[in-house]
Each structure stands twice: as C-alpha cells, then as structure tokens.
C-alpha cells in the first residue's frame, strides 16, 4: 500500500502476481511480509516502484544477516527467517527500546520449552478483516495458521516489517526466566516468571485499570492458564 500510494513512482509491481514479485525481488520465502526494511528511501519522480522495493529488501536482508552472525546462544530461532518472524512479533508487541530484549526473552524461553507463544498480534494478523478491533476469547480460540494460542510454534511468516532494533533483539534475548508479560498501560510491560505472578499483574494493570483506559485498548483476555501470556 505504501508503494501504491507513492504517486511519483512508476507503478510496475501492482499488476504482478505475488509469486512473480517475490522472484523479482529475490525473496525465496512464501510471503513478502517482513522483507521491506522500514526506512526513508530517496528516489526521483518516475522511478520504478520495483527499484525502491529492491532497495528495501536488500537492506532488510543485510540487517538480518548481520544480526544472525552475531546471535547469542540463548536464541531459540533456528533460521534467519524464523528470526525475522520473531522480530516481527516483537515489533508489534512493544515500541519501547528497553523492553524489546525482555519481550524477546519471554518468547525465546517459551520456544525452548515448547510453550505456545500466546501473542495477540499474531491472532489479529491471522483474522485479517474478520478482526473487529477488540480481541475476544473466541478470537483466541479461532484456529488459523497464525494463532499462537493454538499452534505451539512460530507462525509461518512474519506479521509485520520489523526494524533493526527488533531483529537484533530477536536473536539476542535478555538473560531472564520470564515466561509472561502484560501491558502496564503506559507503553511498558510487566514481566513475570510464574503464572501466579502474571495473574496478579493482570489484575493490577488490566482488570483494575480505569474504564476510560480500558476503552482505549483492545480487550485483553481474563487471566487463565490457556490465555495468559
């Protein structure tokens, strides 16, 4: 959509089937999602959109390769593409720089013990246009390839275009035993090792949140073992 809205670009990619576009961009994966590095790209009027896309893909590939080469032993992703996928989840879960490596630690810790990631952004992505804007228990139970409350692994593709900060965090998680986190309502998160501690945090930061704040945020599930994250 970003490229289509750039009216100064010569539109060449819009009419291409996605598989053909992936080949043209040198993307071996089965999806374009996640491969365009978020950045500012300079071009002249009349430039082909495909040329700018290639710049974005080349940058993302370079960033991913750089991160993969410096990954820590604590990283539980098995391939660069899995790292890109996890990075996209981190990107959607937090915009706070100080929380990225902590969020990464939660997901890497869960992957290491075969625990479902149970992350809402993947559910929302899987629902697509069916998502109402307020996540519900039914949404969490609706099976899609991206519902990480249902599947015990990473989703099949990224769900967003991650920045360098999220890519680096995905392969260099903080050294913690955290398995849960919950939004505190101010952009930061509270992290917990146990379900009991997490449920207390949910009561503190979600259930006791003023109604005006609750309306401003997507509804979060009640703290049960199946839906806690």
Predicted regions and their residues:
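Residues in well-ordered beta-strands of folded domains
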Residues: 42-44, 124-126, 147, 181-183
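Short glycine/proline-rich, acidic loop/turn segments that cap or connect secondary-structure elements
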Residues: 135-144, 167-179
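Substrate-binding clefts and substrate-entry loops adjacent to catalytic sites
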Residues: 46, 63-75, 135-140, 147-155
